[in-house]
């Protein structure tokens, strides 16, 4: 005898929301500040499914979908040098649905991360790059029902990359 299982699409679900984006280059500033700029975006999503939380009785959102997320970017860019810093955030989200006997649903906690990069063109044929990912060493957390019922926690390492691009 074999037990066979497979993913199955849900019957119904609702998603409502909006996204805002803004970008501005400060070209009106005196040199060298005229090469500065910012970018920002924000997304709000309200979702629901027919699935009901076994403990609270409330309708559950779509798994994997945060209610709030945003990115803030500051940059400087000219013909030979560029630098960029970006902070990205997403609010908690439902990871998986569980019954009352299992202690409830699992969620991934809110998380923010800072990344940065720089690039310099030394000659038309030689460019150096430096990139830092997760400079704030953000922590990934998963919990069961409530944030104080932690089931997983891992501090992501900061990653630094250096690159050389040459053309012949």
Protein language model regions, located:
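Generic secretory/membrane-interface signal
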Residues: 3, 13, 109, 128-131
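Short, P/G- and charge-enriched loop/turn segments at secondary-structure junctions
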Residues: 7, 59-60, 104-105, 149-151
């Amino acid at each position: 005898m074999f037990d066979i299982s497979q993913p199955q699409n849900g019957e119904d679900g609702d998603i409502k929301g909006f996204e805002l984006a803004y970008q501005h280059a400060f070209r009106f500033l005196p040199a060298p500040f005229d090469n500065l700029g910012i970018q920002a975006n924000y997304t709000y999503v309200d979702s629901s499914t027919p699935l009901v939380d076994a403990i609270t009785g409330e309708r559950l959102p779509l798994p994997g979908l945060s209610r709030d997320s945003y990115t803030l970017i500051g940059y400087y860019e000219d013909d030979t040098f560029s630098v960029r810093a970006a902070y990205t955030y997403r609010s908690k989200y439902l990871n998986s649905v569980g019954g009352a006997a299992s202690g409830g649903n699992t969620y991934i906690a809110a998380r923010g991360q800072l990344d940065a990069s720089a690039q310099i063109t030394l000659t038309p044929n030689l460019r150096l790059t430096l990139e830092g990912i997760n400079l704030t060493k953000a922590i990934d957390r998963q919990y069961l029902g409530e944030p104080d019922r932690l089931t997983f926690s891992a501090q992501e390492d900061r990653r630094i990359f250096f690159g050389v691009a040459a053309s012949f």
